[in-house]
Design a protein with these regions (language model features):
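N-terminal, positively charged nucleic-acid-binding surface of large information/translation enzymes
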Residues: 2-239, 280-316, 344, 351-396, ...
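Glycine- and acidic
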Residues: 4-9, 48-56, 114-118, 143-150, ...
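Gly/Pro-rich turn-and-neighbor structural signature
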Residues: 26, 155-187, 194-196, 208-210, ...
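Structured ligand/cofactor/substrate-binding pocket environments in proteins
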Residues: 59-71, 78, 87-88, 156-159, ...
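Acidic, turn-prone loop/beta-hairpin segments
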Residues: 88, 180, 184, 190-196, ...
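Core structural elements
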Residues: 127, 136, 603-616, 636-647, ...
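Catalytic adenosine-cofactor/nucleotide-binding cores of aminoacyl-tRNA synthetases and other
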Residues: 369-373, 545-549, 553-634, 724-726, ...
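C-terminal low-complexity, glycine/proline- and small-hydrophobic-enriched intrinsically disordered tails
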Residues: 722-890
Length: 890
């Protein structure tokens, strides 16, 4: 037990001075580092690796702070707790930044060459990759920095290569032409996670396709007239009576004069537009599925640069099916070479001239945008590498259905299951250079060789094809492929390591809802496939962060918050963390951030600091250890605060166990600020408290800051180090043991009644306009004067002069204290009488209104409920005012 000398504490708590000093102390001591220890139960979290291009934002605060809280909590429980950090190479995001920088120099990645380009990318990573780590340290995050990994580390790259090769050898990786998300600016495919929908104003164009036999045909509705040049059918719902007579017949595309069939497909929504939709399989995901069901040809008329092109065939098609489509090239020449949106204008103008444009209506639509370049995504057919996911998805789905994998909140398990039930093959190749290059080589005849390295590839090529002349595929793997291996690759897999043996599976994964399918499901699929175990037992889904008005934060709305600029400098890391978590609720997936919670948290730290200064300045000094006096020596106030402390510690423990961080923060604030500082600290100033207060104050503070430490690590450490304590740091201190916190429910109830009476007296002081400096004169039943500490506490907390009177019914809670003050009771009596008359009138009016059956029947439910609420409030005010008048006496 360390007992500090009586310290000279600063008058104010300064996070800007304390937090960097204590964090440096933690780093120097190595307290965040762990080794696998089979003697202790593991608690491990693999940090979702942030992008090296990223800056810390509020989303990081809501996602990573809970991970730090959980790790600190489980470490204090004595578990082998470790939080494993790392960073993601963020292939497309990083490449976008680098290409932009090269453009300023008049260069491209091609002019630089692959090797020189990658060398520059690594230099860029070394220069800027540390920014996110620095931000995390300023937020007080304590992962095991010695174990930090990067998704392009040699060991992780070896794991990625092994998984690709094994999946290929098992027949689950293949090369094929499929519809993909194409970013014309990044010149790469994108995963669904890298595509963001944004609402935009556009038009719905109604275009007439005449019947092949010269009839009226039908009118289709589309928001993308530029792709109609690749239409191969018009689809209608099979039950739509308007078009049943046309099913199986042909209509003719205007301008290019090509006949296409009318087909029936249940995917068509009869209520959308005209109920007839153009089918362009090479440029729309739904159309692609329709095209596959009906075996339609799939010509492409937009190239990889986003420009209209003569029909392109990205797969083998029969000459007979190609011929009529290829023949239209001459008639569409006026549009070829133009950007797709410029071509749209020209096509619409031409349709208008030809009389084929029937209508043009304003329409609000969702456009798919690249999250990296903000370019509009173009669905395109492309030859890419894919994973056949269904054999991997089924075990992952069964793990959830069996209860082996759980989600908090539970509803997100359904999101996970729905994604796996409707899963499609996974496009894993990207046309970028920064990333894990595909372990794929091609012979001069385009035969495929998949191998772990070039030497193996050449050996295989010689054995199979008699030559080792090879060229490597320039593409890299989807970032989510390497991220899917994260929980086991960072533990040394495929090697059998102590870390892998003891720390896999992890206990929890903390992430956001938007990547449940894209990342969580892939970690589960690959973990089960290659390690034979789930990667984690629980997935905790954090809320998305919005502004106070429920709007997404963005620069354009001028509501974006940078915690490193806008929060930490003002409120400190503790205030920022506490403020964020206080607003986090399991029942809501919208965290509508209100900065006032951070300000309140900072003031809370100041409140605790002042309580510490008071405790350390007690004339009787502090005990040599954080131990309590004998029970018989404890006062009523002591017993009350210990009972409340135990309840607080129990609530916080259950909250941490259940990921209810907002509940934990509420309980800590309620106890620390109001129960402890506002009531107990003040109560210790009463006569009769001197003998025990130092020990109780020290014990309560020591216990409380340990319970609060996971959320607010710095102020709790500073307080803990000032008090008598065991160990070198609160980081490794033990979690409060409920068995060591005594509880006195009966005595606590008595003191709770005293607090109720003091609050009544404080309200009376305000009502009667008694100045804070003036003493109140209070009469209490004579029976109270014999109960230890009650009268003295009332006198101290209410600033009252106490006298007694005969009477009372023997119950502290039920006794009414007769109060005499220094106010002008005549004027008060007149004021209360007028207020009672007004309130009686309002009650009568409201009762009459609610008794009117016509009002109740015709008014909305909200209006009736509001009137009932007003009536209840009037009644409460009336009772309170009558009680205040009665308290004045005769």
């Amino acid at each position: 037990m360390t007992t500090p000398d009586r310290p000279e504490l600063p008058k104010t708590y300064d996070p800007a001075e304390v937090e960097p000093r204590l964090y440096a102390r933690s780093l120097e001591s190595g307290v965040f580092h762990e080794e696998p220890d089979p003697a202790r139960p593991p608690f491990v979290i693999s940090m979702p690796p942030p992008n090296i291009t990223g800056r810390a934002h509020l989303g990081h605060g809501s996602t990573y702070t809970p991970q730090d809280v959980l790790t600190r909590y489980h470490r204090m429980l004595g578990e082998n707790a470790d939080w494993l950090p790392g960073q993601d190479h963020a292939a497309i995001a990083t490449e976008t930044v680098l290409i932009r920088e090269l453009a300023k120099e008049g260069a491209t990645r091609e002019s630089l060459g692959r090797d020189a380009y990658l060398a520059r990318a690594w230099r860029w990573r070394e220069q800027y990759g540390g920014e996110i780590d620095e931000a995390f340290q300023r937020l007080g995050f304590g992962p095991d920095w010695e174990r930090a990994r990067f998704t392009l580390d040699a060991g992780l790259s070896a794991a990625v290569t092994k998984v690709f090769v094994d999946l290929y050898n098992d027949g689950l990786v293949y090369r094929g032409t499929r519809l993909v998300n194409w970013d014309p600016q990044a010149q790469s495919t994108l995963s669904d996670a890298e595509v963001e929908d944004e609402e935009r104003d556009t038009f719905m164009w109604h275009i007439r396709y005449l019947a092949e036999n010269g009839g009226d045909g039908l009118v289709i509705a589309t928001t993308r007239p530029e792709t109609y040049l690749a239409d191969v059918a018009v689809a209608v719902h099979p039950d739509d009576e308007r078009y049943r007579h046309l099913i199986g017949k042909n209509v003719v595309l205007p301008i290019v004069d090509r006949a296409i069939p009318v087909i029936a497909d249940a995917a068509v929504d009869p209520a959308f537009g005209t109920g007839a939709v153009k089918v362009t399989p090479a440029h729309d995901a739904t159309d692609y599925e329709i095209g596959q069901r009906h075996a339609l040809p799939m010509p492409t008329v937009i190239d990889f640069d986003g420009r209209v092109a003569a029909p392109i065939w990205r797969y083998d098609e029969t000459p007979e099916r190609r011929a009529p489509i290829d023949a239209q090239a001459e008639k569409m020449r006026a549009f070829v070479g133009f950007d797709r949106f410029e071509a749209r204008k020209r096509i619409v103008d031409e349709l208008r001239v030809r009389g084929a444009l029937v209508d043009e209506k304003p329409y609000r639509t969702k456009l798919p945008l690249s999250s990296r370049t903000h370019a509009v995504i173009e669905p395109l057919l492309s030859l890419q590498w894919f994973v056949t996911v269904q054999p991997l998805a089924q075990p992952a789905l069964e793990a959830y259905r069996s209860g082996a994998l759980r989600f908090v909140p539970e509803r997100f398990g359904r999101t996970y299951a729905a994604g796996l039930e409707n899963i499609r093959d996974w496009n894993i190749s990207r046309q970028v250079w920064w990333g894990h290059q595909l372990p794929v080589w091609y012979t001069p005849d385009d035969d495929v060789v998949v191998a772990h390295d070039e030497d193996e590839a050449k050996r295989v090529a010689r054995e199979r094809y008699g030559s080792d002349e090879l060229r490597r595929d320039p593409d890299t793997l989807d970032t989510w492929f390497s991220s899917g291996l994260w929980p086991f690759s960072i533990l040394g897999w495929p090697e059998r390591t102590p870390e892998l043996d003891h720390w896999y599976p992890n206990q929890v994964m903390v992430t956001s809802r938007d990547i449940i399918f894209l990342w969580v499901s892939r970690m589960v699929m690959l973990g089960l496939r290659f390690v034979g175990k789930l990667p984690f037992e629980t997935v905790f889904v954090t809320p998305l962060v919005f502004d106070m008005h429920g709007r997404k934060m963005s620069k354009s709305l001028q509501n974006a918050i940078d915690p490193m600029v806008d929060l930490v400098p003002k409120y400190g890391a503790d205030g920022t963390r506490f403020g964020i978590l206080r607003q986090m609720r399991l029942e809501s997936q919208e965290l509508r951030f209100d900065e006032r919670y951070c300000d309140e948290a900072k003031r809370f730290a100041t409140k605790l600091w002042n309580a510490l200064r008071y405790t350390c300045a007690l004339p009787e000094g502090l005990p040599g250890a954080a131990v309590l006096p004998a029970r018989e020596k404890l006062t009523l106030a002591d017993k009350w605060i210990l009972t409340e402390l135990r309840a607080c510690a129990e609530t916080v423990t259950h909250a941490y166990d259940g990921f209810a961080f907002g509940v934990a923060a509420d309980a800590l604030l309620q106890f620390g600020w109001y129960t402890f500082c506002d009531w107990y600290v003040e109560a210790t100033k009463a006569e009769g408290q001197q003998q025990t207060r130092g020990a109780v104050l020290s014990f309560v503070l020591n216990t409380f800051v340990r319970a609060m430490h996971p959320i607010a690590p710095f102020v709790t450490e500073e307080i803990w180090l000032t008090l008598p304590h065991d160990g070198a740091t609160i980081v490794t201190a033990s979690w409060p043991d409920l068995a060591e916190i005594p509880s006195f429910p009966d005595d606590a109830a008595v003191f709770g009644a005293v607090i109720d009476k003091v609050e009544q007296l404080r309200n009376a002081r305000s009502e009667w306009a008694i100045a804070p400096k003036d003493w109140m004169r209070v009469e209490v039943p004579a029976t109270l004067s014999t109960e230890r500490g009650i009268v003295e506490t009332i006198a101290t907390l209410a600033r009252a002069q106490i006298s007694t009177y005969d009477g009372g019914d023997g119950s502290v809670r039920d006794r009414i204290l007769a109060v005499r003050g220094v106010a002008d009771t005549t004027k008060l009596r007149e004021r209360y009488t007028r207020e009672i008359a007004r309130l009686e009138s309002e009650v009568a009016r409201s009762e009459k209104k609610l008794a009117n059956e016509s009002f109740v029947a015709k008014a909305s439910a909200d209006v009736v409920a509001a009137e009932r609420a007003k009536l209840e409030e009037y009644r409460r005010e009336l009772d309170r005012t009558r009680a205040a008048l009665a308290a004045l006496g005769d």
